[in-house]
Structure formats: C-alpha cells, structure tokens
Amino acid sequence: MRLVSLLAAFGSILFVASPHSSAAAAPDADAQVRTLKLNELAIKTVENHFLPDGKRKSLSQLTGEMKKGKVAGAPRGLFVTLSKAGKTRACWGSITPEHDDLITATVYTTEAALNKEYRFAQVKRGEVKDLKAQVTVIKAVTPIDSIRAINPLRHGLFVRQGGRAAVLLPGECVDAHYQLVQCKLKAGIPVNSRCQMYRITADVYHK
C-alpha cells in the first residue's frame, strides 16, 4: 500500500472547499489541467535531476521552459508519486497549495520526492527508465462526520487529532473503514479514538 508524506502545517488553517466551490466544480479548468500532462512533467523533472553537472537545469529554468505556451493552472495542493513495477519509490506533497501554479508545484514536489523521501531508499539513476509518475491534484478538502461520506476509490482521507495527522490518497483502499484505520495508524492516532476527518476530492493524472 502506498503511503504519502503530509507537508501541510498542522497548526495552520486548512484549505477547505465546499462541493459547490469554484475549486470543486470547474470543468473548463479541469480540461486545461489535463492538457498539462503533469505526470510527464514529473518524469522530465526526474530525468533532469540525474543529468550530469553542466547539463542539469535549475528548477526555475526547467519550470520556465515547461510553462512556455501553456496556462500553468491555478494553485492547488498536489502530490507526486513515483513508482517502479507497481511499487512506490517516492511520494511527496501537500493538501494545501505551496506554489503559484500546477507546473511549478509538479516540478518542485517531484524534486522534493527525490531528495526528502525518507521511508524508501533514494531513487537511483539506473531506475529512471523504469519509473512511472502519478500526480494527484487536490480539488477540495471537506470536513465530514462519518466515513459513510467517503468512497475510498474516489476520495482520499485526511485525519487529524491535535498535532498528529495523516493522508491517504484516492484509490489506496477499497473499504472506507479500512481507509480510516490505516490513516489513523499512519498518524499515530489510537484506532478507537475520535478525530477530525476530511474528505479529499482530487484528480489523478498518470499514464
């Protein structure tokens, strides 16, 4: 099962959008995001990361080139997952926007996955050709009172209790109760205790 890193500051105000907000219901914007092919941009970022000195571009240069002729997308929370043969090699991201647009977020989050991921062995140069990238773009984070409000195949889950918190992305579980238990365990929250729950609505981009 894939685990993800949560970079949202626990003490800050969460980005919470209702199902009727512009972030949750913008089909034209969603169509524009699909044209960005964010998963391909993530792979290009990985390839750039492993180029030798003198050929490797700075992240700002790489981002600038990727933005040419494109609408870069409104800022949203975003996760990048790198996998090999169906197994996660790195995953990083935040449920809240950390960059000005989606292209910038994809590039910098991919680089963070390569440099900051601590649960898996670091990705090596020889693995690049076998890597696949998935980019999960957060559309809404909505408070819920019951797991009945979640379809784990379509929704992610964010749980929080005091300073403990964790995220599971959409599609990581097939059963809502199991999703809640796993998310609590990941956060270090006692399974039988109450906690704040948030449904994550997101679009997932991969090949």
Spell out what each predicted region is.
Residues 1-4:
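Positively charged n-region of N-terminal signal peptides that target proteins for export
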Residues 7-17:
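Bacterial N-terminal signal peptides
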Residues 17-26:
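Signal peptide processing junction and immediate N-terminal pro/mature segment
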Residues 25-207:
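Basic nucleic-acid-binding interfaces
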